[in-house]
C-alpha cells in the first residue's frame, strides 16, 4: 500500500514536471525558430520582444554556443553568413499605372453569367446523355428478345485436333 501511494505521488509529480518541460520546450522551440527566421531573412528592423522572450533568447544563445563549442569538428572554418542589407522600398514610376482589381459588372446575380450558363448547359447535357443511354439499353433489351428465338449456335466444325482426340479415347467411368 505504501509503495502504491509512493508511485501515485511520483506519477503526479512526474506529470507536473513533464507539463513544465513541455511548455518550456514549446517556448524554447518558438523562440529558436523566431531567431532563425530573423537571421535567415536578414531582418534589420527591431522586433518587439517581451522580457520573458529576451531571457529565453539569452538562454537559447548560451545553450547553442555551448553546444557548438563542445561539438565543433576539426576542419576548415565555416563560411560566415552574408551581412544583412536593409530592404529598399519599391518606388513606383509615374509612367506605371497601378493595377486595379477585377470588378464584376453590376448585376443581381452573385455568379457571373458564364458560370451559370455552363452549369445549366452541363446539367442538360448530362441529362440528355443519360436518357440516350437508357433508351439504348431498352432498345438492346428489345432486340435480345427477338434475337433469342432466331439465335442458334453454329454446328461445331471438325478440326484437325479432333482426330488427335480420337486417338486417346476417354473412358467413361460407371459406378
UniProtKB/Swiss-Prot annotation:
Q: Where is this region: Disordered?
A: 68-111, 154-175
Ranges annotated as biased composition (Low complexity): 95-106
Keywords, alphabetical? Late protein, Virion
Identify the GO cellular component terms for this protein: virion component
Subcellular localization is given as: Virion
Induction remarks: Expressed in the late phase of the viral replicative cycle.
Q: Which family does it belong to?
A: Belongs to the asfivirus H171R family.
Q: What is this protein called?
A: Uncharacterized protein H171R
Amino acid at each position: 500500500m505504501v509503495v502504491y501511494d509512493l508511485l501515485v505521488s511520483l506519477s503526479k509529480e512526474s506529470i507536473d514536471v513533464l507539463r513544465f518541460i513541455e511548455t518550456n520546450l514549446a517556448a524554447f522551440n518558438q523562440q529558436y525558430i523566431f531567431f532563425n527566421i530573423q537571421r535567415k531573412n536578414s531582418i534589420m528592423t527591431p522586433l518587439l520582444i517581451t522580457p520573458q522572450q529576451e531571457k529565453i533568447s539569452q538562454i537559447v544563445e548560451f545553450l547553442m554556443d555551448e553546444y557548438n563549442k563542445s561539438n565543433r569538428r576539426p576542419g576548415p572554418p565555416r563560411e560566415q553568413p552574408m551581412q544583412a542589407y536593409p530592404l529598399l522600398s519599391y518606388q513606383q514610376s509615374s509612367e506605371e499605372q497601378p493595377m486595379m482589381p477585377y470588378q464584376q459588372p453590376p448585376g443581381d446575380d452573385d455568379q457571373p453569367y458564364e458560370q451559370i450558363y455552363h452549369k445549366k448547359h452541363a446539367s442538360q447535357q448530362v441529362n440528355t446523355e443519360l436518357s440516350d443511354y437508357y433508351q439504348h439499353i431498352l432498345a438492346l433489351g428489345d432486340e435480345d428478345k427477338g434475337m433469342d428465338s432466331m439465335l442458334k449456335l453454329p454446328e461445331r466444325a471438325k478440326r484437325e485436333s479432333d482426330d488427335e482426340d480420337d486417338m486417346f479415347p476417354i473412358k467413361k467411368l460407371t459406378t
